[in-house]
Amino acid sequence: ETSKLLIDVIPGDSMFALKYTSFGSRLDPNGAHAAIDEIANHGKQRGVKILIDAEDILYQDRCFELMRRYNTRHDAHVFTTYQMYRERAMKELKTDIERATFRLGANLVRGANVGRQYGLFDTKKEVDRAYNEAVDVTLSTRNVQTILATHNEESLVRAKRYERNSYQ
């Protein structure tokens, strides 16, 4: 309920970020999803975009379901996060692009986790390469609206090669 009240006071065309775990997803995943679904619906009605922070890959399918429900062919209202420090993130991003019949909302994050954990890149150089590949893939694909969550100069220079209306 608090999230809906916050959406009511922020200007339309703003973005509201949330996390599944903030809604008790570990205890009640279905209840958390229902609450986020309600917030996404309210946000769309008010013109406020919803960014779902992918603190855990367990929620990717649920995020995709919300994008399918609220995103249109021309505009993304719900965005999910792709953690490019994960070795499988590029494959997941490409799969989502291929199966999306709507405008995919992609928030690209580089991430701080590197190495010594299964499924993560071992070096920052590998993470940078994956992030820059994701920049190229998303910004060159018509049905993707991209948020570049980075301050990395190389990635930002790379993004400037594309039309500004394809990223934020």
Task: Give the positions of each predicted feature.
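Positively charged, amphipathic and often flexible ligand-engagement surfaces
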Residues: 1-168
